[in-house]
Regions:
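The serine-hydrolase catalytic nucleophile loop
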Residues: 1-10
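Glycine-rich "HGGG/HGxG" loop immediately N-terminal to the catalytic nucleophile
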Residues: 14, 25-36
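Alpha/beta-hydrolase active-site loop
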Residues: 34-55
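Alpha/beta-hydrolase fold nucleophile elbow
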Residues: 55-67
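Glycine-rich nucleophile elbow surrounding the catalytic serine of serine-hydrolase chemistry
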Residues: 65-75
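Hydrolase active-site cap/lid region
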Residues: 75-134
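Short beta-strand/loop motif that positions the catalytic acidic residue
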Residues: 146-147, 153-155, 159
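Short alpha-helix in the alpha/beta-hydrolase fold that links the catalytic acid
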Residues: 149, 163-172
Length: 176
């Protein structure tokens, strides 16, 4: 939440109302396990519905997220969303959890493919037990095939945590 404070302040100064929630298992939010955007997409939809309930049907909502929040934003785009959700902004979001895990295993930990495959398989099973889904399910690009809203994708070329190639995969996937 602290890293999003500057964005929230800017949007507020520009006259927008801002909802800045903690994602699952972050900050003051409930939950014991981070879902990497996949279960959180339902939370985002609930927050949008709550905003409409609290501020009226003329509300206009833009969903914005950075990194895992960017992936969450794109994963949310694949759901049936209220008409008041007008646009989405995803900054440095990954194309899929599996692709991001594979990239990190190779880039950060320098694991050879022969080791990565069984490790990632085990992580997927552990995640299924803890979070209720296999890591292969959490895909921004698959969700974006169902998106028809305007989507602004932002990604820096020097990003070494989420590879820049993923923004192009997301761009090609969206219908918005």
């Amino acid at each position: 939440k602290e890293s999003m404070g500057a964005y929230a302040a800017l949007f507020h100064q520009l006259g927008y109302n801002v909802l800045l929630p903690d994602a699952r298992a972050h900050g003051q939010s409930q939950g014991h396990y981070i879902g990497y955007g996949w279960p959180e997409r339902y939370d985002v939809r609930k927050w949008a519905k709550r905003l409409i309930r609290d501020h009226g049907p003329k509300s206009q909502i833009v969903i914005f997220g950075v990194s895992m929040g960017g992936a969450t934003t794109m994963m949310t785009s694949g759901l049936q969303l209220p008409a008041q959700v007008k646009a989405l902004v995803a900054d440095c979001g990954y194309s899929s959890l599996q692709a991001e895990l594979d990239y990190q295993a190779g880039h950060l930990y320098h694991l050879p493919m022969l080791v990565r495959i069984p490790v990632e398989g085990a992580l997927s099973v552990i995640n299924r037990v803890a979070n209720g889904f296999f890591t292969q399910s959490a895909s921004s690009t698959r969700a974006l095939h169902h998106n028809h809203r305007p989507l602004l994708l932002i990604h820096g070329a020097a990003d070494d945590f989420v590879p820049t190639k993923m923004v192009w995969q997301n761009y090609r996937a969206t219908q918005g």
